[in-house]
C-alpha cells in the first residue's frame, strides 16, 4: 500500500508497504544488474550503506544463470541473501539496446543472446513469467523504449503497442500471482510511460495507463541522449497526468542534481548506475561536487573523501590511500569508492525525506545544488 504522507509543491514524501518491507520515498534504488552491485559489494554492505531497494535485471538473469534456476533456489531474495525489497526491470531496455538482430512483432521481440548468440523470444507474458520466477517485490511491465530521434509516426505506433503489451502484462501478472507455486504471490506491477521527446504523445499515454489501476507508474526513455532541459520539460508535462497516490519512478536517472530537480517535479523512485560506475573509475561524490581521486593533488591528501561522512571508506581511509589503491589497480580501491558513492546517494535521499518532513525541501535543494557547484 502506498501512502502519500506530505507534499511540498509537487514534491512527494510517501511510504510504500510491500511484502518485503517498507520503502520510504523519495528513494534511490541501488543497481545490481546480475544480482550484485559491480564493485565487490555484498548484501551485508548494502545494509551498512542504508540501501532500501536493490534493482536487478530480468534479461541478464534470464540469460544467466536462468530464472528457473533462481526459482528452484527459492527466488531472488534467497539466492542473493537480501531481505529488503527488490525491483526487477522488464528486460525491454536491454533487448532494445544490447541485443543484436532483434525483430519486433506484436507478440513480442525475437533477438540473439549477447552471451552465446542463441535465439530468444521475449514478450509481455514471458517477461512477467521470468519476473515471477525471480519473485521480486516489484516487476516492471515489458515495453519498447523508442529512440529519442525516432520519427513521430514510429513513436506513436510503438507507444500504442506498449499500451497493448501493458494490458497483457497486467493479465499475466494476475494469473501468475494466483498460482500455488509462485515465489511471491504479492508481486507488484509498475507500468511505463513512453513517447520519446513528444510531449503530447507522452501525456496521452500517461492518461491512458493511469486508468489501468497499476501499483506504480514509471517514466521511461529519458536520460538516453536528450538534454537535461528536455528531460525536465517532459517531467513537467507528464507527471501531472500520473496518479499522485501511486509511486512515480524516473528510470535510469541520474546525477544528484537530476534527482533533486525530479523530486521537485513529483518523482519519488530513482535508479542509476552512475554512483557505482563512477566509483569503479575513481570518481567520487562530495557535497562540493564530484572529484577524481586519480588526480595528483590527492597524492598527499590525508582527509577522507568527505569530512563527516560515515561510509566504510570515509570512516577508515584517506583520499591518498584510496588513490594509491586505484593506481595500483587493487580491487579494494574500487570497492571503497563504490561504497562511498552509494552511501552518498542513499544519505542524500534520507536528507531529502527529512527536508520534506520539515517542509523545507526547496531550501535544501537550492543549498545542495549551490554546494555541488563548489570546487574541492
Give the predicted meaning of each segment.
Residues 147-152, 156, 216-222, 331-334:
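Glycine- and acidic
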Residues 21, 162-169, 209, 238, ...:
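Hydrophobic alpha-helical packing residues
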Residues 21, 54, 89, 131, ...:
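Conserved, mostly hydrophobic/aromatic
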Residues 1-15, 23-32, 39-40, 143-149, ...:
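C-terminal extensions of enzymes
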Residues 121, 125, 152, 156-163, ...:
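Non-membrane alpha-helical structural segments and their capping/turn regions in soluble enzymes
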Residues 172-182, 246, 352-364:
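Surface-exposed helix-capping loop/turn segments at secondary-structure junctions
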Residues 1-183, 296-299:
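Non-catalytic, usually N-terminal nucleic-acid engagement modules in DNA/RNA processing proteins
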Residues 163, 172, 176, 184, ...:
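Glycine-rich phosphate/ribose-binding loops and adjacent secondary-structure elements
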Amino acid at each position: 500500500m502506498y501512502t502519500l504522507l506530505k507534499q511540498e509543491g509537487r514534491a512527494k514524501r510517501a511510504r510504500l508497504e510491500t511484502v518485503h518491507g517498507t520503502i520510504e520515498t523519495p528513494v534511490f534504488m541501488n543497481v545490481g544488474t546480475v544480482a550484485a552491485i559491480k564493485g565487490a559489494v555484498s548484501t551485508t554492505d548494502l545494509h551498512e550503506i542504508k540501501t532500501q531497494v536493490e534493482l536487478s535485471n530480468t534479461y541478464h538473469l534470464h540469460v544467466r544463470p536462468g530464472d528457473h534456476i533462481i526459482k528452484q533456489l527459492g527466488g531472488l531474495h534467497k539466492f542473493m541473501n537480501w531481505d529488503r525489497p527488490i525491483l526487477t526491470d522488464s528486460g525491454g531496455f536491454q533487448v532494445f539496446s544490447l541485443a543484436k538482430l532483434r525483430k519486433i512483432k506484436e507478440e513480442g521481440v525475437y533477438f540473439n543472446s549477447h552471451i552465446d548468440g542463441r535465439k530468444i523470444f521475449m514478450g509481455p507474458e514471458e517477461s512477467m513469467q521470468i519476473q515471477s520466477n525471480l519473485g521480486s517485490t516489484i516487476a516492471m511491465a515489458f515495453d519498447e523504449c523508442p529512440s529519442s530521434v525516432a520519427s513521430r509516426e514510429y513513436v506513436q505506433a510503438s507507444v500504442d503497442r506498449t499500451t497493448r503489451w501493458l494490458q497483457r502484462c497486467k493479465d499475466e501478472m494476475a494469473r501468475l500471482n494466483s498460482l500455488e507455486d509462485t515465489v511471491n504471490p504479492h508481486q507488484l506491477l509498475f507500468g511505463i510511460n513512453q513517447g520519446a521527446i513528444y510531449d503530447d504523445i507522452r501525456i496521452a499515454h500517461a492518461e491512458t495507463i493511469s486508468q489501468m489501476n497499476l501499483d506504480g507508474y514509471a517514466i521511461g526513455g529519458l536520460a538516453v541522449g536528450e538534454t537535461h532541459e528536455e528531460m525536465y520539460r517532459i517531467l513537467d508535462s507528464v507527471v501531472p497526468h500520473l496518479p499522485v497516490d501511486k509511486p512515480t519512478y524516473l528510470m535510469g536517472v541520474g546525477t544528484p542534481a537530476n534527482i533533486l530537480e525530479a523530486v521537485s517535479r513529483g518523482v519519488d523512485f530513482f535508479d542509476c548506475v552512475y554512483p557505482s560506475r563512477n566509483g569503479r573509475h575513481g570518481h567520487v561524490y562530495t557535497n562540493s561536487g564530484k572529484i577524481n581521486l586519480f588526480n595528483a593533488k590527492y597524492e598527499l591528501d590525508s582527509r577522507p573523501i568527505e569530512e563527516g561522512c560515515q561510509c566504510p571508506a570515509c570512516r577508515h581511509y584517506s583520499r591518498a590511500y584510496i588513490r594509491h589503491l586505484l593506481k595500483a589497480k587493487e580491487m579494494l580501491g574500487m570497492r571503497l569508492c563504490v561504497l562511498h558513492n552509494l552511501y552518498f546517494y542513499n544519505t542524500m535521499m534520507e536528507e531529502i525525506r527529512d527536508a520534506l518532513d520539515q517542509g523545507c525541501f526547496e531550501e535544501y535543494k537550492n543549498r545542495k545544488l549551490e554546494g555541488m557547484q563548489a570546487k574541492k
